[in-house]
Regions:
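Conserved GNAT acetyl-CoA-binding A-motif
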Residues: 97, 104-116
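Conserved active-site alpha-helix within GNAT-family acetyltransferase domains
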Residues: 94, 118-136, 141-142
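A conserved beta-turn-beta hairpin within the catalytic core of GNAT-like acetyltransferases
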Residues: 68-78, 88, 133-135
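Active-site beta-strand termini and strand-to-loop segments that position acidic
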Residues: 54-56, 142-144
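Active-site rim helix/loop that mediates acceptor-substrate recognition in acyltransferases
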Residues: 29-50
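Conserved N-terminal entry element of GNAT/NAT acetyltransferase domains
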Residues: 1-18
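Conserved beta-strand in the GNAT
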Residues: 52, 58-67, 77, 82
Length: 145
């Protein structure tokens, strides 16, 4: 039996940055590599919380909680959810999301949100099976350079 662990990154380490960059390439072909400065910021700031899912001390998945307050309340976004391609189909994505939701509850009351491309059929089915519902809205993006 494998030892499965889940933890929040609270200090920058090169091994963590390397794991993030490996997983990012599997999440999006447009992702740029994370720098050690970005890792340091994420590990120490209050609004971003990076989590790793490990099997036998090997990082095989990650998720991020982005937390902010607006006039209508606290919002928590789940971002960058990915399980290493070699470990998919074993229920680890569900475990990762469920553990991330548990962490989000420390910010309650809040709205917990996430986005997922329509082409990610399995991921969308997973999110709905856990209790998320599809919200009819438009999400817009602008790159500010």
């Amino acid at each position: 039996m494998h030892n499965i662990t889940f933890f929040e990154v609270t200090e920058p380490k090169e091994a963590y940055r390397s794991a993030v960059n490996n997983l990012l390439t599997q999440l999006s072909q447009n992702a740029k590599p994370m720098t050690i400065d970005e890792m340091t910021y994420m590990a120490t700031c209050n609004e971003s919380h990076l989590f790793f899912l490990c099997i036998d001390n090997k990082i095989i998945g990650m998720s991020t909680l982005a937390v902010y307050r607006s006039p209508i309340g606290c919002k928590v976004w789940i971002e960058d959810v990915v399980v290493d391609k070699d470990y998919r189909g074993q229920g680890l994505g569900r475990a990762l999301i469920e553990k991330t939701i548990k962490e989000a509850k420390r910010f309650a009351p809040c709205s917990l949100l996430l986005t997922s491309r329509p082409s990610r059929i399995e991921a969308n089915a997973l999110y709905q099976s856990i209790g998320f519902w599809k919200r009819e809205t438009n999400v817009y993006k602008m790159d500010i350079i």
